[in-house]
Amino acid sequence: MDHLVFGVPDLARGIELLEHRTGVRARFGGQHPGRGTHNALMSLGGRQYLEIIAIDPMQVEASSLHFPELKHLSEPRLIAWAVAVEDLVETARRATAQNIDTIGPLAGSRAQADGSLLSWQTLRLSGPRTEGLPFFIEWQKGTAHPSQHSPSGCTLASFEVEHTDIEWMRHTLKGLGVDANVVPSATVRLKARLQTPKGEVEFG
């Protein structure tokens, strides 16, 4: 697990919500130029972090949306999770071996408040059965991991993927080289529990 993506309709209100629930105020990260979003971050310790993301009103003409589900988001929820890998090409090969289409690797970057640049590449899985599966990120050499300079105080107590077909999901994750807790459910949903200054808090 590299990071969790918490989608919100409005970034400022999302930051306030997280501070109210956890006692930690996420720091504004920046814009994703051309992808229509902006974010704020908080560290979860151990090279893990929580990304709060929303549509950027200053990028209404963006050519593509970082997370299309944000268009129809009416309330805050976990919308994605990312796994860090050292070789996206190998990850793509693993996905193809399981008949899963991939998008990428795609280069990404974001200017930070201090002027430094975060750079990465992502690989996304595409297809009718990919809901609940992670996307993959490869941080470029020389890029400081966001967990190192984001507000701290929270840690990830647990994470699970709720799924309608747990055997398929477990088999697929294993084939992708990913270890995650999968539990049965009538719907596909992500659920995380954070240990915070205000106690354990659940997000879904």
Go through each PLM region and give its residues.
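Glyoxalase I/VOC metalloenzyme domain signal
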Residues: M1, F6-R25, L44-G204
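N-terminal low-complexity or amphipathic/hydrophobic leaders
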Residues: F28, R35-R47
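A short beta-turn/loop motif at secondary-structure boundaries
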Residues: H32-R35, R110-Q112
